């Protein structure tokens, strides 16, 4: 397995979509009714309110020999230039990371934001990808996106129907 947990043998396990934990991240296990154990990063906003509840949270750590690929979200702010998306994609795949999803938002005629979902092996692999992407001349800023406020978004959508 990819996680070492005492007393969790046979428990269904999944990775939280809010914070996308990857090997190397400090993590915590949340025992969720119907979903088994959900692994979050320790700094995830969604875990903050329940982290002190021993009934729901368990101490977990990555198996040192973890294998596989893990999803991570990136936000890249860049200057619009011909071929910049191709350059970005080539740079990322050149680091042996796979792009699952990509979307762009044009801020204005000069700047765009590119949201990416990538597969990486661990934090070291992610750091290598980030370093290479930051070397692209048109790239202004690269950030790993974690802990989108999922609940607030849902509440605002539901509230909009009143």
For each feature predicted by the language model, list its residue ranges.
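A short, glycine/Asx- and small/polar-enriched loop/turn
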Residues: 70, 108-114
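Short secondary-structure junctions
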Residues: 93-99, 135-139
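Short, low-order "capping/linker" segments at domain edges
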Residues: 114-121, 151-162
